[in-house]
């Protein structure tokens, strides 16, 4: 199992290559990354047979920015038109018994077509795996991840459930709320799922908390905060959706989001403004560093080139700034499924 397969947003294969190559070099695990433009996946081929397993053991998946999902295996294999299950059972003879099964496809137009095949194939495959003793429901065992590039080509991979994506392919199935004024609302909801354990939502996303939404109009992110019954200051020169204003929980301030400062410390600051990432990074540094908020979710809009390098530079600057202030801040950064040319940062200031 010398190959690490990683899913990603189409067009960001180069960022995944740069990110995993940097980590592998730091960990002294030799190998090379390979990908094709807009293929929505990257393979990192390790020189050592156990290289992919070592990478997954040494890295936290949650700390990776651009990969949506990962799995280790020997690479893609060919399947015949018939007797696919028999071929897969033979391939799995050298694998450990697995505790769960996910059939995955790539986030491409071709992948959408393959998903129909996967839905039909999963039931008989699952039954055959259970009968052969290759699959038993046990969250402590590795997850079997079968990534189909077509009905005839599959990556037979493994991953630990607690150190891989929360959802198949790293894609959450969130329902757009009809009352929300824009689809951007799903970005904030996905961020909460990604960065906050579900068991902590009632404590960290509680009613009557104070929140500030910078660049709020028309109110996609504000809607999520109001839906949690928070009291929100919506900062934007543009108009807010009327249904949000009728809630009685929103104070609309028509000022520049980068200039606004709250009169008192708030629980949450969220921001989805189209601006250069360095300026938004400085905004984060101020709000968290000066204690204006306890937690923040902020989108960084990415440049056309050197996107991974730019994000890494901003995150490093934030860490150095907080360290210099003697602050303990948990920082997370991920390109979410609902993100486009951007990444989402989550920051939580902890009291020492």
Curated annotation (Swiss-Prot):
Name the record gives this protein: Ribosomal RNA large subunit methyltransferase M
Broad class of enzyme this protein falls into: transferase
Protein family according to the UniProt entry: Belongs to the class I-like SAM-binding methyltransferase superfamily. RNA methyltransferase RlmE family. RlmM subfamily.
Cell compartments where the protein resides: Cytoplasm
Keyword annotations of the record: Cytoplasm, Methyltransferase, rRNA processing, S-adenosyl-L-methionine, Transferase
Residues binding S-adenosyl-L-methionine: 184, 217-220, 236, 256, 272
GO MF entries: S-adenosylmethionine-dependent methyltransferase activity
Lineage start: Bacteria, Pseudomonadati, Pseudomonadota, Gammaproteobacteria, Pseudomonadales
Pfam family, one: FtsJ
Record text on subunit structure and interactions: Monomer.
Natural source organism: Pseudomonas aeruginosa (strain UCBPP-PA14)
GO biological process: methylation; rRNA processing
